[in-house]
Amino acid sequence: MIEDTLVLIKPEGVQRGIIGEVIARFERASLKIIGLKMVLPSEEIADAHYPVTEEWATSLTNKTRESYTKKGVTPPKVTDDPMVYGKQIQSWLKKHLKSGVIVAMVVRGNCAVEIVRKLVGSTDPKSAAAGTIRGDFSIDSYDLADSERRVIQNVIHASSSVAEARREIAVWFSKLVTYY
């Protein structure tokens, strides 16, 4: 099934000069770049990219608790309200997204969402396999990010589902051109 997905090379990825390498990896996997731009995200774009919904906030809260439990660490007591926690994380995500120029691109191909996610690797750079974008280029960790009360800097964002890709593409691109 031919799909479109959104990829953002985050500020640390742009600063490290890996834009061409990221694009080359997608193209070597027979994926097409059908939208591409460099942008300094506005507050409005960051809000639209990271909307706080009850479902997202609850999922985030549960994942965070599970992560601490796996490490054998008691999670810090922040709040029992997932929406309050979600809004705090959203503010960190937005701050990071707006901290520098990013590259936004739409990638098209057969099973593009799944293939891009495999090429990108785990969101946790320590768990990302060698040969994935995060495994090769990320140097951050959740432990360090948590200790500094910020989001992890893992160089790249990729939509996690076809539905999420549709929503995110609409945030970043008003028009796409098929050139092939």
Where are the language model's segments positioned?
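Non-catalytic terminal and connector segments of soluble metabolic enzymes
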Residues: 1-180
